[in-house]
A protein has these predicted regions:
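Membrane-embedded alpha-helical bundles of multi-pass transporters/translocases
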Residues: 1-512
């Protein structure tokens, strides 16, 4: 198991590094112009459906089902179930892909209304979407076969597959874009071909694992029907999340040209700490809280939630402060080269600062939600999520004109804060969560250490020369932030460095 965790962790880290390199290259080649806007809208479309039907709701029902069949009935029964699921998924994905290709202008009329009337951007977005939409078919089947491999404890190929997405995207920028009139199309073809490569990789791994696949005729067996019934709650939850994403895209297209790209780059930077910390924390917490509640250990469940709250706040607060206070410096060092200008970095930095304000509360949503799921309550988080979507839409409409590209980012952060506050209030009201003595001691001190860090970063930035931030200046900001967060944190006994380093190591293992 340790070897498997190391393998997955290595591939995951490689994927993140290559993903950031891909974004740097895209920024250098496309910048924030109309081609970049059209490409990012076009990329969102297959990813929206992928997260809805592939990696999210489908895997939530498929992976537990095939794991149970594999361990109770053996490889032959698991193979039969996987074949049935593949046939059903391939049929629906193929139909969805064909319909998407036919009705692509209508889809983008809804998703990118701001492009309508701007013939160049709208036409380009339609053309790019038609190139990339088949990626949906390949990547959703890749997610299915990755679930099969994970159930068989074969983790490497599934973890390596996202690396291919980044490699093909980078290769298309380096070696195909120079020979095309529009580099956006080179990147779009790289995305689609990467889907084929990822599917080929996991199919090869399944054959190596001893599962001999045949493609059966389409049939809805009792097991498949049961799996789709179990998909329904997860599909609703995923739908709420993707509706939130869609609102941000729609509003972005209604803003001045370049806004979609600016929001994309800012969000990608914000997702780096969020993906490592929040997802890992939520994944690890749910089984622990469920186990305590099943045994009637409510006090232990509350302790688990308290320790998770502290650790997530301890890790996300300095990340949020660093990204918010030094947002311009982060964007300068990461993206200012090629077509991405210093002015683009200023605009993207403002959006990044607004996104970063919501980083801790978004992570805390991942902590509070298991408190409901572990008790069999899936509807309360869903209802709160719907209310948060409505608030996000309202705030977007209020902010879009005065704040431009900062508006969607700030609306996302504020609606996430509303979501987290509602989850906390209901858990507390139902006596399912309350701060214990250790949390009451630590949390104010963590916040105070964060305030000291913010003041120090702000002061040092005032002393730096104007203009694009250099790498030495950026490293100075990182050093100052670290010293003025960890120093007060240790002195105030909010945490100690050994505990902090231990949390980072555990987060990496759980993220893997």
């Amino acid at each position: 198991m340790i070897r498997g965790a190391f393998t997955v962790g290595a591939w995951t880290m490689a994927s993140r590094v290559l993903g950031f390199a891909r974004d740097i290259l895209i920024a250098a080649v496309l910048g924030t112009g109309p081609v970049a806007d059209a490409f990012f809208v076009a990329l969102r479309l297959p990813n929206l459906f992928r997260r809805l039907f592939g990696e999210g709701a489908f895997n939530a029902a498929f992976v537990p089902a095939i794991s149970t069949i594999l361990h109770k009935e053996g490889l032959s029964a698991a193979t039969e179930f996987a074949e049935e699921a593949t046939a059903v998924m391939a049929f629906w994905l193929g139909l969805l892909t064909i319909l998407g290709e036919i009705f692509m202008p209508g889809l983008l009329y809804v998703l990118a209304p701001g492009f309508v009337g701007h013939g160049g951007r709208f036409g380009m977005a339609v053309a790019l979407s038609r190139v990339m939409f088949p990626y949906l078919f390949f990547i959703c089947l890749t997610a299915l076969f990755s679930g099969v491999l994970n159930a068989m404890s074969r983790f490497a190929a599934a973890a390596a597959a996202p690396v291919l997405f980044n490699l093909f995207s980078i290769a298309s920028m380096l070696w195909l874009a120079p020979y095309t009139r529009n580099p956006g199309f080179a990147l779009a073809w790289g995305v689609t071909v990467s889907g084929i490569a990822q599917l080929a990789l996991v199919l090869w791994a399944i054959r190596r694992a001893g599962m001999r696949f045949i493609w059966p005729r389409l049939r809805f067996s009792a097991r498949i029907r049961q799996m789709f019934r179990r998909m329904a709650p997860a599909l609703l939850g995923a739908g709420v999340t993707q509706l939130n994403v869609s609102i941000d895209i729609i509003i972005g297209t209604l803003l001045p040209a370049g806004s979609v790209s600016i929001l994309y780059y800012a969000d990608r930077v914000n997702q780096l700490p969020l993906g490592v910390i929040a997802t890992a924390a939520g994944t690890a917490l749910l089984p622990a809280v469920t186990r305590h509640i099943a045994l009637g250990e409510e006090a232990q469940a509350n302790i688990a939630l308290n320790r998770a709250f502290e650790s997530v706040l301890m890790l996300t607060l300095p990340a949020a402060i660093g990204l918010a206070v030094a947002a311009r410096a982060v964007m300068d060092v990461a993206f200012v080269r090629g077509a991405f200008t210093a002015h683009n970095a200023v605009l993207a930095g403002h959006s990044l600062a607004a996104f970063a304000l919501g980083l801790p509360v978004f992570a805390l949503i991942k902590i509070f939600t298991p408190g409901f799921y572990a008790r069999g309550d899936t509807m309360t988080p869903l209802k709160i999520g719907v209310a948060a979507v409505a608030l996000n839409l309202g705030l977007n409409l209020v902010f879009m004109h005065p704040l431009k590209a900062v508006g969607p980012a700030l609306a996302t952060s504020l609606s996430s804060a509303f979501n987290a506050a509602c989850l906390f209030a209901l858990l507390h009201k139902r006596a399912h969560f309350g701060f214990d003595a250790l949390s009451r001691h630590r949390i104010p001190r963590i916040l105070l250490a964060g305030a000291v860090m913010a003041a120090a970063l702000w002061g040092v930035q005032r002393l730096l020369p104007p203009g694009v931030t250099t790498i030495p200046e950026f490293l100075l900001l990182v050093l100052v932030g670290g010293v003025f967060y960890f120093g007060p944190g240790v002195l105030l006994r909010a945490f100690d460095l050994r505990e902090f380093l231990g949390l980072l190591r555990r987060r990496r293992r759980k993220a893997a």
